[in-house]
UniProtKB/Swiss-Prot annotation:
Post-translational modifications: Is synthesized initially as an inactive proenzyme. Formation of the active enzyme involves a self-maturation process in which the active site pyruvoyl group is generated from an internal serine residue via an autocatalytic post-translational modification. Two non-identical subunits are generated from the proenzyme in this reaction, and the pyruvate is formed at the N-terminus of the alpha chain, which is derived from the carboxyl end of the proenzyme.
Entry protein name: S-adenosylmethionine decarboxylase proenzyme
Site positions for Cleavage (non-hydrolytic): E63, S64
Annotated active site: S64 (schiff-base intermediate with substrate), H69 (proton acceptor), C84 (proton donor)
Organism this protein belongs to: Thermoplasma acidophilum (strain ATCC 25905 / DSM 1728 / JCM 9062 / NBRC 15155 / AMRC-C165)
Metabolic or biological pathway, per its Swiss-Prot or TrEMBL entry: Amine and polyamine biosynthesis; S-adenosylmethioninamine biosynthesis; S-adenosylmethioninamine from S-adenosyl-L-methionine: step 1/1
SUPFAM superfamilies reported in the protein's UniProt record: S-adenosylmethionine decarboxylase
GO terms of biological process kind: spermidine biosynthetic process
Lineage, opening ranks: Archaea, Methanobacteriati, Thermoplasmatota, Thermoplasmata, Thermoplasmatales
Amino acid sequence: MEVGVGIHIIADFYGVDSELIATTERMYPIIEGAVEYGRLTKISSDYYQFRPKGASGIVLLAESHLSFHTWPEYGLVTLDIYTCGDPKTADDAFAYLVDKLRPTSISTRKIVRGDMIEEAGENQIEEAALH
């Protein structure tokens, strides 16, 4: 059985409006909105504006982090959402980003982090019983 300590969503959004993702000024409210919508706890954030266009940012969360990079020339946004605790928070933040960025296609990987915790615990119990 998978227990894990968190959910890690790694996604590439294709076909996103290049003007929407060209600047930190446009991305900031979208990313911060995802944090709020996902009921995540923001500790700090940092955003970087590339020249002539493109943006990157990271939000440090009590639950872990949310980061992004944009390539307006390709209509591409790459996202990383890692949250510990209730997996619904990551899913909700992700759904918010899909709604606001409106990609034409998405490539997503969802990883359970720390999924061997229970297995490791069982092995330790078995080893202790042998001694």
